[in-house]
């Protein structure tokens, strides 16, 4: 797909404590590579990827492919950048929330990140996929899978154990998030309403500031 040759531009935000592997996961997804020498993200960065999304119809048939331009925003996990990070929450349509399977505190902080999303995202029930990263470091693991899955079930969000080093479940996690977003858009009664994190190929968003309160209750929020 050439520049501008897409149906939707969709913004994802990767969140989580510093050092959980957000940059490495996004790099693995967009480039299929792992770089163990990434330095800590300062502020905000992003990567891009073009994909084709095909949804199954009610009869099981695969529908027309939607051409998606994904912007994957990479945020700093340090507390001193928190105000900058939260400023980007409303502009994103979906959230990839990561913790480090070898760092219990990063898992305990997942609740705080979700609380921040509920306060600052485009609606109180945004689409989130939870990822326990660094699954390849099994001998260093301190967070049990059943504990992480239990937390995800409490919030009603999908959970994957990922590895930026070998690519395990990285694409699946992001594809699941995209599927959630596209289905949310399909549920919109008024198809002219699309959250601010989605831009049509003509460059227009459909958010109307005069109807912001009405929009907060739209599309399954």
Curated annotation (Swiss-Prot):
Q: Where is the lipid attached (S-geranylgeranyl cysteine)?
A: 219, 221
> Does the keyword Ribosomal protein feature in the UniProt annotation?
no
The record's region (Disordered) falls at 202-221
Write out the GO biological process terms: antigen processing and presentation; blood coagulation; complement-dependent cytotoxicity; cytotoxic T cell degranulation; exocytosis; exosomal secretion; melanocyte differentiation; melanosome transport
Q: Where does GTP bind?
A: 16-24, 74-78, 133-136, 163-165
Q: What is its main location?
A: membrane
Q: Which InterPro entries match?
A: P-loop_NTPase (IPR027417), Rab27a/b (IPR041837), Small_GTP-bd (IPR005225), Small_GTPase (IPR001806), Small_GTPase_Rab (IPR050305)
Q: Which UniProt keywords apply?
A: Acetylation, Disulfide bond, Endosome, Exocytosis, GTP-binding, Hydrolase, Lipoprotein, Lysosome, Membrane, Methylation, Nucleotide-binding, Phosphoprotein, Prenylation
The record's subcellular locations are:
Membrane; Melanosome; Late endosome; Lysosome
Q: Name one GO molecular function term.
A: GTP binding
> Compositionally biased, Basic and acidic residues: which spans?
211-221
N-acetylserine PTM positions read: 2
Query: Which family, according to the similarity comment?
Result: Belongs to the small GTPase superfamily. Rab family.
**Which NCBIfam families does the entry mention?**
small_GTP
The protein, known as: Ras-related protein Rab-27A
Tell me what gene encodes this: RAB27A
């Amino acid at each position: 797909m050439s520049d501008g040759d897409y149906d939707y531009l969709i913004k994802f935000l990767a969140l989580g404590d510093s050092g959980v592997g957000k940059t490495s996961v996004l790099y693995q997804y967009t480039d299929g590579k792992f770089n163990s020498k990434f330095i800590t993200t300062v502020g905000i960065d992003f990567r891009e990827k073009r994909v084709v999304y095909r949804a199954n119809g009610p009869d099981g048939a695969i529908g027309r492919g939607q051409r998606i331009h994904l912007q994957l925003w990479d945020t700093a996990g340090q507390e001193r950048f928190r105000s900058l990070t939260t400023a980007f929450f409303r502009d994103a349509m979906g959230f990839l929330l990561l913790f480090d399977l070898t760092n219990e505190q990063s898992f305990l902080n997942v609740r705080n990140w979700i609380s921040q999303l509920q306060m600052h995202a485009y609606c109180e029930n945004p689409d989130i996929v939870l990822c326990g990263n660094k699954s390849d470091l099994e001998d260093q693991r301190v967070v049990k899978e059943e504990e992480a899955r239990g937390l995800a079930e409490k919030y009603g969000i999908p959970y994957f154990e990922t590895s930026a080093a070998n690519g395990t479940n990285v694409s699946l996690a992001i594809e699941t998030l995209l599927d959630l977003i596209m289905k949310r858009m399909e549920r919109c009664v008024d198809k002219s309403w699309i959250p601010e994190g989605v831009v049509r190929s003509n460059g227009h968003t459909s958010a109307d500031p005069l109807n912001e309160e009405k929009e907060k209750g739209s599309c399954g929020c």
